[in-house]
């Protein structure tokens, strides 16, 4: 149950399950073996927030060793006590969790830069001496000594460039109407399977909200209804002058495979941002010769990142983002997060990444049992309240809905 399976799922053939749910089965099989060492590569990618929290508790209290590859900050902070970074072919081992490591890495990079500059100055002075006295017989011994000195130098390197302070701003877009999306008694079914039942939903201009809930509860379905990809029953009105931008994991299919990475972004860039194209691509892990690769040779993750960068360059006043951080490293997520915080349009984001959502959204919509429930406040306000609600359920205390401040059920 911790990974989101209901008892009714236990007898279902695995061929009926999506790839994400099959990954959960594989994770459950590993956890049940109780090995002395867990090696988990991005274990949270196919989990919802509740399942991630359960896995955190399980791993944090596990008596064996746990090695994680993850880009989920909150998950790492709640589970790990040691951080190992691989940078420029070297391994750095810190006996601290992620957040403390970030501060120590910052200090290390500052020290590296200072040492690198001092070494470069010494190399430059030595080369000038060699060039000046190369053909002077009285200095021949000194020149040869300096040449040997240069050849023996262990050249210092500085860790990869830190793009976290890169200021990415969305291009200006037209102002939309006050009511951006207005749904009333909206329902959606796939055959006999009901996903959404008579839900009401309204988002106003400038609001930033999160869609959360277990996989299969309708978050992506409702997102696709909003952008016009899926039919529905009931009423849905998109506001005046709304220009929608949508990102999902399959958006990479819309890219022109015969264009290069740089050409793809150059076509979308307008105005002052054009001068920052290469920096943007570098921030999203396209560096050096990568920008000259054809789209058709990129991996699925690379295509997904490229589609996201292109979206950020286009003028939209409503953004609907479905798991935008799945293929991003932490620096890329930071840049995207800061851009979304300063974004003056309307935002709907489907995500299980608590650290990413924190500071962006001011309202959370929980998808559960074919309805959506509105929670005022940020993602951690929602999670704190969920813990209280779960305790109330365990204690079987009935709380009248009128007493549930900051929360309302939207749907019948």
Annotated model-derived regions:
Residues 104-159:
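Intracellular alpha-helical coupling/juxtamembrane segments of multi-pass membrane proteins
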Residues 1-116, 165, 170-412:
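ABC ATP-binding cassette signature C-motif
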